């Protein structure tokens, strides 16, 4: 029997069935950071001027993009690892390579999260375009949650590089205070003042 089963996007009509079978069901948390260099927003609705959570900046951390060959080389290098022994589920470099660089439909970018020369985590990112506007979506992160602390400058650099309105992140399990320390704002379901479209 597997130790861990999860899914997203289940039909609301089947929620009672999953609850009856003993599964925990709920909603993913939605976090975002807005590009501080943007003044004209075509995707965000009713922007209130709150770009990101105020947080300390950790200048020792940076994001480095991996191309396909570089990530594949990590798959064969036992000297590289991510120190995330307490993270569930377990993922490997090869998982990221197969899942994101070999996807038959979508194009993803993979970034290594480094503190100095130590690899703390991997981030999978997708660019979503609508007319002339772009947003970035983190679709996967593997690593220690604390590795994201102080990374606001790295996320703002990505937003400026892609000329995107915002970067967002749906997840459950990562502590909200940890994500706040990386600059992310948690979107409240009850608040209508800012609109961030849900995308498939």
What are these regions (language model features)?
Residues 1, 59-61, 117:
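Intrinsic-disorder/low-complexity loop/linker signature
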Residues 7-12, 28, 64-144:
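A conserved beta-strand-loop-helix scaffold within acyl/acetyltransferase catalytic domains
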Residues 2-55, 115, 122-149, 153-200:
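Active-site/acyl-donor-binding loops of N-acyltransferases
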Residues 43-74:
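Conserved N-terminal entry element of GNAT/NAT acetyltransferase domains
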């Amino acid at each position: 029997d597997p130790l861990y089963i999860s899914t997203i996007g289940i039909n609301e009509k089947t929620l009672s069935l999953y609850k009856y079978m003993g599964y925990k069901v709920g909603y993913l948390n939605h976090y975002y950071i807005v590009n501080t260099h943007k003044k004209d927003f075509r995707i965000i609705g009713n922007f209130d001027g709150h770009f990101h959570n105020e947080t300390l900046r950790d200048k020792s951390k940076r994001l480095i993009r991996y191309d396909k060959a570089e990530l594949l080389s990590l798959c064969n290098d036992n000297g590289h690892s991510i120190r995330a022994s307490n993270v569930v589920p377990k993922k490997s470099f090869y998982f990221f390579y197969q899942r994101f660089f070999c996807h038959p439909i979508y194009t993803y970018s993979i970034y290594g999260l480094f503190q100095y020369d130590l690899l703390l985590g991997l981030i999978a990112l997708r660019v979503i375009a609508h007319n002339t506007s772009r947003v970035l979506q983190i679709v996967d992160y593997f690593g220690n949650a604390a590795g994201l602390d102080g990374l606001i400058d790295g996320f703002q650099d990505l937003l400026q590089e892609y000329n995107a309105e915002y970067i967002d992140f749906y997840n459950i399990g990562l502590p909200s205070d940890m994500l706040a320390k990386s600059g992310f704002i948690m979107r409240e379901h009850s608040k209508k003042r800012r609109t961030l479209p849900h995308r498939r």
